[in-house]
Amino acid sequence: MTKIGDKFPDFNLKNQNGETIFSEDLKGSKSIVYFYPRDNTPTCTTEACDFRDNLEDFNELNTKVYGISGDSEKKHSNFSNKHSLNFDLLVDEDYQLSEKVGVYQLKKSFGKESMGIVRTTFVLDEDNKVIHVIEKVKVKTQIEDLKNFLKE
């Protein structure tokens, strides 16, 4: 698992509009990079809408927000449009970045095991160094936890 003090891995991923976002694009401001299992599921939708509703506060804290899952560009586009999301959703269909940061793991759900993204959030500094990690995210408290961390 990528941890505090590590450089976030380099990447180039498409967003919901088909534009390529490079890890270099994140430099110059802090970034929240949150990994989530799947578009249009209840908890993932709540999480995305929480970021949407608080984006202005994160902007005031000079912090960008990026969501990443294994969904396709088309699914991201539909999800973003349906919920009026105001930040980039990045496509990691082959799970390469998810594997590099250690969030693509064996999960148990309803007694079944399968590989998938474990909900995890990273905060990066202006040089893409990891300065905060939230593992096993609690969606209800995540936004306030992130704001409090960024205000310190």
Which residues make up each language-model segment?
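Chalcogenol-based redox active-site neighborhoods
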Residues: M1-E152
